[in-house]
């Protein structure tokens, strides 16, 4: 029975292991912007539900009680001994105990402290309680702990299995033995959190027989179902298998690697004889090695893309992989103090207040960059600058070196500006004057130094850019029509890369890219297929990327020869292509795709097995895929699909992104004790993997020449033993190098010996504690080496016992705290250099407590108000603060920016509540010594929540059965549902069914079902469901997947059937084509019906041409011109015929009129116009043969030919028209024609007529206006004398209008010739302002108007009369005392 229970428990644990992905307990830090990886110094933490330690099914020997520590000795004592003394939170406030540290004199009271629950940890400076309770601190830096064992995930460098084991041994560890499920789960969680999918990790296990894998300690590798992937492996071309120690010459794919029962999956082929010895060196004494065959008998953790999870995979021992080390020996409390020492700031032990003047070694803030000097610009700019910048105190000085090879050995030549006047060093700038490629091209680096040491920069390369000239002539290119064509640029020699442009016929008439034409980054001009318009002269232009220097190539012709055939769709040349060819992380990657073939193809980019990333987008009609700021996560296979109506093809390209070394664990400054040890660790992510070198004061530490008793170098780890200030105080650097770059990380080592000092971190003068709580007083003096501690209370020495404990860090904990613990406490720190002490007074206060709390449960409605209130009693010496929380989040006044939430000390008001306001509200009262809280559960009733899981169970042409799961009822029962839908034709959500009563189909899941009718056939539907209760309509659900209704025949007839027009013999029928959503199937076309009005039989025709849909032209007898026809239209699709439209009556096409207008007469209207009349035309069908639209008048000067005639179109059926724009005193011939929609009829006989002579060309002069009374004025002017080419004057017009109106509103007062040259203008409005002009007129028309415009204002009538001496009443004001004549030229003289 017990065995069965254990088996079931194991199975449950395995299930948990298989589903660990979503169970992380904390947010991950942002990944590295280039590598895409998590920071390598990030160490994940686990909560109780995540760690196997707290798994209730855990069956190991450890206690599952989360309050129990592992029984590991800490300074000779079990951690359980210390557990009771770490209760409480670091810092001054919050749940937890009193921790008194630098800058914090207040503690607190709280519940039992959980050492592995990160949520209970405070953040006041260095938390010594954290240090001694966080299990990871019992392991060295960059190691993680699990079950009293330390683990290190080595992320650089990659090594084969034997060297990986050797490195682990150097760390006093070994390759990990995975012998139980808990450890396996722990490893998987770390691999997931560290985002290492692209890497593989060696463990110790190897295969000893079919399905038998054994760890190095002879324990069995943990056996988990489906944990091995035997069919995935590293391809042979992977750089890991191309290590220079061996040469594998046959392809791995020739063997059967998929058989898990095969004993030793062998690597076929031979090993080069010169490398056999090296290869044998990798194989242990018990490894099988015969017939020069190697075996895949090692195990790695690798991410399976097929199964999307981490699995075991077999591997070759000679592969270069990452690896995992484990060590029980390293798990020690000594690491706590070591880590605390390693966190000493760089100003540790220095009594300097000005942070900017703290002595410090140099460190680079700007590295020199690669520079290209454009030799084509040397006449304008003939110098080049390389720059570096370092900080430090004293300010660093700089030296520059040139890196040269002498006898195949790299040497650094110091640049001396005093000896070579071409060089200048200013600050960190190296300026080279008149640079010459033969002398100056190469790599440079700078060295920054001050009295604390020297550091070197990264290398920067100085290159020389140039572009040679194109060849002067180029032969013609020839291509066949309708076939693809590529024209290569043939650029001149150049450095660095150039951009390509193509000109057509002349420069700068650049070729415009379109769906058919493409200019690639390879420089070529591509045509999907050639057309005759491509026949032209072309020229290629190049421009360097480092300046505006460019070159224009010669023009050459492209000849196009006819060809009736079309090229089938193919990929052009070697497309798809990637630029740059060897992409590096951080580059912008450009993937190009180009195809030849007719018709024009479309392009689509996809990523194999994954969607395109967010930083990727397509341009240039989909031909080009751009990946911005590429990372190693962008590695993979990308496929281009080309499609035209005749063919579809797909081709892939693999991107393998390299990466320059980037430090994930940089060096950090170290302040170490005299005669102690220091370990520098650096780690860089790089592709290919990085190799490491170490430097001291810019000089390389050669492992062959160092003192091996003191210096230990193991790849990226440097250890120095028995530190001495004179020998070891220096600047140290780690160099990570691959074929792309060498990166450096630097740090200062300061060896220190000093007596304890409390100057920077004294104990607080007063420490407030809470009665019966936990109190922690941190004693943190500066000292080297770490001091011993002694505590006194009121002058009496106290020991570590009872309710007081002294931690190895010097921290004093008191738990529980009583009134007897009040007093003066003294911490005494001493080492061999001296002694110092600091004092603190402990005051014990009464804890705070609630006297009023909110109700435990509140029920409210949406848009209502919530009011909460709490009150606490507290000691008068304490200051308290009220904090309100909602679901754990602290609320602030106007928290959401809408003014709804009002936080007023111990009162909380929430206005206009919504469903998001439901949840737990907490009133927290905080003081310096403890905090308390009270929770209230608030329920909000409102409209229902959004349903979920909407899907279609069954669908037909117009109906669908939909199922969903109800969302939250939000306190009220659901009454009914509304079902919304949208289609591929219309993306707007509309109600497709309302007031739906659903049927429950599964009472366990509350799944509902309903039928929707009146859907549109042949449509892709998405559905959404909203629930309705007494309080309103709820939130719509997320859209369902897309479902398509079945096809059906059209349901409606075409609309707006009509027609008419066209040429004689045509019957044109028009209609509105059905909308896409009305077509109900593919293959839509139409059938038209027609017949003479009154006839019985219908004629018909089907119209299938897509380009003229909506119009049909059928042939009828020619003599049926302008005849009424009855027509109708019917829609047809691939399923069947729709209904016929209603009958519409239209006319057939018209014929041209057959009669000419009779007796045309033209009479002169004025000097520039004729009035032409004629006898009305008989409007019979036989004469007009359609509908008369108007008349066309033809006129020309009698002195000109009729071919020079001008036409005037009169769009009316009246029998007269005015022809304007003629010349004065000129004879014209005039003809008239009738016209309809078919054209014009025959011309009438011509008629000759002369226009009048000109209108008067002189305006009247001496125009004056006089007021007669408030409504009458008198106007006088002088006579106008006409010239011989003018018609005699017939009279005059006085034109007057209100000044605020336009002249078109003017009234004309006519004065015939022969009368007195004056006019009285009556009926004017008193007080109004008027404008006035006078003109002469004749048969030739109106003459020019007087100028300027006269402006005057009428006077107002007065009621008060004044008697004259003659006894008559007169108006005091007839018009203003004088008429105001404004010489405003409102209008030009006519």
Curated annotation (Swiss-Prot):
Tissue occurrence: Expressed in ectodermally derived epithelial cells from stage 12. All these tissues, such as epidermis, hindgut, foregut, salivary glands and trachea, which contain pleated septate junctions. Expressed by ectodermally derived epithelial cells and along peripheral nerves. Not present in midline glial cells. Expressed in epithelial cells and glial cells of peripheral nerves.
**SMART domains linked to this entry:** CLECT, FN3, IG, IGc2
Locate the Fibronectin type-III domain: which residues? 946-1048, 1053-1151, 1156-1254, 1259-1357
Glycosylation sites recorded in the entry for this protein: 369, 537, 604, 629, 691, 774, 912, 986, 991, 1166, 1171, 1307
Task: List, for all copies, the residue spans of the domain called Ig-like C2-type.
Answer: 362-463, 468-561, 576-656, 661-745, 756-843, 848-939
Lipid attachment site numbers (GPI-anchor amidated alanine): 1362
State where it is primarily located: membrane
Q: Where is the signal peptide?
A: 1-18
UniProt KW keywords: Cell adhesion, Cell junction, Cell membrane, Disulfide bond, Glycoprotein, GPI-anchor, Immunoglobulin domain, Lipoprotein, Membrane, Repeat, Signal
- Give the UniProt subcellular location, in the record's own words: Cell membrane; Cell junction, Septate junction
Q: How would you describe the post-translational modification of this protein?
A: N-glycosylated.
Q: Which residues form the propeptide?
A: 1363-1390
Which cystines does this chain contain?
388-446, 489-540, 593-640, 682-734, 779-827, 870-923
The Polar residues compositionally biased stretches are 58-67
Q: Look up the record and give one Gene Ontology term from the biological process aspect.
A: establishment or maintenance of epithelial cell apical/basal polarity
Which Gene3D superfamilies does this chain map to?
Immunoglobulins, Mannose-Binding Protein A, subunit A
| Assembly information from the UniProt record | Forms a complex with Nrg and Nrx. Forms a complex composed of septa junction proteins Nrx-IV/Nrx, Tsf2/MTf, Cont and Nrg during late embryogenesis.
Q: Which family does it belong to?
A: Belongs to the immunoglobulin superfamily. Contactin family.
Q: What does this protein do?
A: Required for organization of septate junctions and paracellular barrier functions. Septate junctions, which are the equivalent of vertebrates tight junctions, are characterized by regular arrays of transverse structures that span the intermembrane space and form a physical barrier to diffusion.
Question: What is the designated name of this protein?
Answer: Contactin
> From which lineage does this chain's organism come?
Eukaryota, Metazoa, Ecdysozoa, Arthropoda, Hexapoda
